[in-house]
């Protein structure tokens, strides 16, 4: 996915998030471990969101494209975010994927809440 394509799908995901009552508080948060596409508040819960798009399913769906290695990078990046933004460090956290599959004119969207996480951290689901 090119940068401009990524920005397009992240904006679409942001609109989906807003339409469901959550608020995006950060976009493209980056640290040495990686990047988190969107960070949102869903009620009192802090949500870290990976956005994916696949035009064709030849190599799997957009949802399936979030590998365990990518999940680990998102988890480590979230820890850095929480360390550097103390106002959010006591909130429960969730890790979601918003996946878009198909051509732009007939794309399907799927928001998988709690797609991955770590059991040993008290604030992660």
Model-predicted segments: where are they?
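Acidic-basic catalytic patches of nuclease active cores, encompassing PD-(D/E)XK
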Residues: 1-27
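Residues at secondary-structure transition points
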Residues: 4, 8, 33, 57, ...
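Conserved catalytic cores of phosphodiester-cleaving nucleases, focusing on short active-site segments
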Residues: 17, 36-59, 74
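Short acidic/glycine-enriched loop/turn segments that link adjacent beta-strands
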Residues: 31-34, 105
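Protein kinase-like catalytic core scaffold
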Residues: 34, 45-47, 96, 110
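Mid-chain, well-packed structural core segment of small domains
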Residues: 64-93
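Domain-level recognition of nuclease-like catalytic cores that cleave nucleotide substrates
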Residues: 84-125
């Amino acid at each position: 996915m090119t940068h401009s394509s990524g920005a397009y799908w992240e904006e679409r995901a942001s609109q989906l998030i807003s339409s469901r009552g959550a608020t995006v508080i950060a976009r493209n948060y980056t640290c040495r471990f990686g990047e988190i596409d969107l960070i949102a508040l869903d009620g009192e819960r802090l949500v870290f969101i990976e956005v994916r798009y696949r035009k064709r399913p030849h190599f799997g769906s957009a949802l399936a494209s979030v590998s365990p290695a990518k999940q680990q990078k998102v988890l480590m990046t979230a820890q850095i975010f929480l360390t550097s933004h103390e106002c959010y460090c006591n909130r429960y956290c969730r890790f979601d994927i918003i996946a878009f599959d198909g051509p732009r004119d007939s794309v399907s969207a799927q928001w998988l809440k709690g797609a991955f996480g770590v059991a040993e951290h008290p604030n992660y689901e």
